[in-house]
């Protein structure tokens, strides 16, 4: 334990020293886009993006990561629900960054960018400036401003606001369909997200709008061309993500089937007894009313761009009503 603490302290001191002492990168330096495979937690299901700055001459090998957040922030969950979560830029030695993902069995793919010495140094200086205490925090937005969009727009700004890519990927897919792809079509997380998302989530995305997703950014950059029509990436280990499937017993469809079976049995019992069980209505009705209140609150008071009322919210009461018709129809 103490060994790990000493290693971590040494890594932090190394980062601080590198950021403070190095003014300009040498001609041997390179900058890479790092893309991390998805993890098991919901917030990690979409993967992650970071920038690596490596200069063997200075020597420097640091990874800049726009995905740092603090659970201990005052009222963190309240702010997260409202879409008012502040993330920040973090920096670690690359070996430490890689080690943390190896421990989670999550591959990290690297794309070395084709940049001039001036462009590399401009990005390096911009990252150093962004890491200043007064600059490192930003208001996170899952779709428009996250760990993937920040590196992309920084690169875009430095090389001249022009990147051409023939990557089409899943052309025509909507926000909802993409998120279902990463969360798993049959997971409870996807079912919950579907209920919270409104009509805005059903808009088809352009190639650039999809770049908030780390995998899409990785694949987009892999065949991208600079303004001078030279490849944007000169060396790459990029590989499409492998999304694990959901076991049938953990799927929301299985849970819904149990729910319907439960209602059918109660309806048959009520019909035999000639007596309506109001308790079952209360038992299932209160959670649904709470869900409507949550969606209503998020629709009017949340900064999340895709949240809103949608027809999928009607699935629960319609399913409930159709099942209870066993009692009503004689």
Where are the language model's segments positioned?
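Activation targets extended, charge/polar-rich intrinsically disordered C-terminal tails
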Residues: 129-326, 330
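A cross-kingdom signal targeting lumenal/periplasmic-facing segments of multi-pass membrane
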Residues: 70-161
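Glycine-rich catalytic cores of cysteine/serine-nucleophile enzymes that process amide/ester linkages
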Residues: 27-106
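Intrinsic-disorder-associated interaction segments
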Residues: 2-5, 9, 116, 186, ...
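Well-ordered beta-strand positions in beta-sheet-rich domains
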Residues: 7, 61-63, 110-112
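Bacterial Sec-dependent N-terminal signal peptides
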Residues: 1-24
């Amino acid at each position: 334990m103490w060994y790990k603490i000493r290693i971590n302290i040494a890594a932090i001191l190394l980062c601080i020293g590198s950021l403070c002492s190095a003014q300009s990168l040498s001609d041997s330096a390179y900058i890479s886009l790092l893309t991390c495979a998805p993890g098991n937690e919901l917030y990690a299901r979409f993967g992650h993006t970071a920038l690596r700055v490596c200069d063997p001459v200075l020597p420097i090998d640091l990874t800049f990561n726009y995905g740092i957040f603090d659970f201990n922030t005052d009222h963190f969950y309240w702010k997260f629900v409202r879409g008012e979560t502040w993330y920040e830029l973090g920096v670690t030695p690359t070996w430490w960054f890689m080690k943390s993902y190896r421990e989670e069995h999550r591959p990290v793919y690297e794309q070395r960018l084709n940049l001039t010495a001036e462009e590399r140094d401009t990005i390096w200086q911009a990252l150093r400036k962004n890491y200043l205490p007064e600059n490192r925090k930003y208001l996170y937005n899952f779709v428009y401003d996250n760990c993937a969009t920040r590196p992309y727009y920084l690169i875009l700004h430095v090389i001249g606001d022009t990147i051409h890519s023939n990557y089409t990927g899943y052309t025509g897919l909507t926000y909802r369909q993409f998120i279902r792809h990463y969360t798993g079509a049959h997971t409870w997380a996807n079912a919950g997200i579907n209920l919270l998302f409104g009509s805005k989530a059903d808009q088809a995305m352009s190639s650039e709008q999809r770049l908030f997703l780390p995998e899409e950014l990785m694949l987009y950059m892999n065949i991208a061309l600079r303004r001078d029509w030279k490849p944007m990436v000169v060396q790459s280990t990029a590989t499409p993500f492998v999304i694990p499937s959901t076991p049938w017993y953990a799927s929301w469809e299985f849970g819904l089937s149990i729910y319907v079976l439960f209602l059918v049995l109660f309806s048959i019992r009520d019909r035999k007894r000639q007596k309506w069980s109001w308790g079952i209505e209360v038992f299932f009705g209160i959670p649904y009313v709470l869900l409507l209140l949550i969606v209503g609150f998020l629709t009017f008071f949340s900064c999340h761009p895709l949240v809103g009322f949608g027809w999928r919210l009607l699935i629960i009461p319609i399913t409930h009503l159709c099942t209870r018709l066993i009692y009503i129809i004689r």
